[in-house]
Amino acid sequence: MSWANESITGEFVLLGFSDQPWLEFPLFVVFLTSYIVTIFGNLNIILVSHLDPKLHTPMYFFLTNLSVIDLCYITCTVPQMLVNLRSIRKVISFGGCVVQLFMFLALGATECVLLPVMSFDRFVAICRPLHYSVIMHQRLCLQLAAVSWIIGFGNSVWLSILTLQLPRCGHYVIDHFLCEVPALLKLSCVDVTANEAELFFVSVFFHLTPLSLILTSYAFIARAILKIQSAEGRQKAFGTCSSHLIVVSLFYGTALSVYFLPPSPHSKNRRKMVPLFYGIIAPMLNPLIYTLRNKEVKDAFKRLIKRVFLSKN
């Protein structure tokens, strides 16, 4: 009997770190702070990119998509986590668990596809600067963004169905902070070897394949930067890519450590903490990285502030 047939209105217990209650208040403060900073930082990028004509370029169009992903990413997990950290009953409804599972998978896969798209944009800008406006035209940008979202959500539909159709035989205690596939597979009372193999295949496809494309793009970018004669030109070219490289390292580095590092005595806690990093900390750091390391964004934000104050006066 599937999850849906067993309990549509039931609840699931999210253990989190309930065996270490002294961690709950510090984690509540950290997650609440991260949530506020993430909301403000990503909304800032979305508004500035939309309102400032100088940022109406493919690079900032894709950055806006990344900010939307990060906003949704953190919103589908953190509010429920904050409630559970301050509650005696650490539960999530069946419907809430399904939504959280679906969105977490969809947004993670979408970001996996979008990051190599952003590296392709940087590749064209630096390696084919004279043809940039011809290659990265508006229609192509819209198509690339749409494909990223479609692939991400399509993958989520498939994995969610495969996970939710498994019988759980009355098991309802999830040893995690959130409803994630590996944690949910442990609730099943049947052999899940095939599901684990499918999850591994999907992880390889959505992590190693995009990462290989990104590294290939940056190999060509690095070669092109080294050919630039002026130090100022090299610095400017490197500056446009360094923020994206940091974001890529944070996202793929932590995600890969979950699925590809061999099991260890600390694997249980690692599987809990790493999703928190790429699902909460990374969305908070992304706008900070792009804002603090990007002169165009900082200048655009200053112009926006001036416009707001001038309009009030």
UniProtKB/Swiss-Prot annotation:
Subcellular location per the Swiss-Prot or TrEMBL entry: Cell membrane
Glycosylation sites: N5
Positions in the Extracellular compartment: 1-27, 79-97, 165-200, 266-271
Keywords, alphabetical: Cell membrane, Disulfide bond, G-protein coupled receptor, Glycoprotein, Membrane, Olfaction, Receptor, Sensory transduction, Transducer, Transmembrane, Transmembrane helix
Coiled coil: none
Sequence ranges on the Cytoplasmic membrane side: 49-57, 119-143, 222-244, 293-313
Bilayer-crossing regions: 28-48, 58-78, 98-118, 144-164, 201-221, 245-265, 272-292
Membrane topology listed for this record: Multi-pass membrane protein
Cited Gene3D superfamilies: Rhodopsin 7-helix transmembrane proteins
The keyword Cell membrane belongs to this UniProt entry's keyword annotation: yes
Keyword Membrane carried by entry: yes
UniProt cross-references to CDD domains, sorted A to Z: 7tmA_OR2B-like (cd15947)
GO function term, MF aspect, one: G protein-coupled receptor activity
BP GO annotations: G protein-coupled receptor signaling pathway; sensory perception of smell
Cystine pairs: C97-C189
Top-level taxon of the source organism: Eukaryota
InterPro entries to which the protein is assigned, alphabetical: GPCR_Rhodpsn, GPCR_Rhodpsn_7TM, Olfact_rcpt
GO cellular component terms given for this protein: membrane; plasma membrane
A matching Pfam family: 7tm_4
Described purpose of this protein according to its UniProt entry: Odorant receptor.
Similarity section: Belongs to the G-protein coupled receptor 1 family.
Name the record gives this protein: Olfactory receptor 2B6
Lineage per the UniProt record: Eukaryota, Metazoa, Chordata, Craniata, Vertebrata
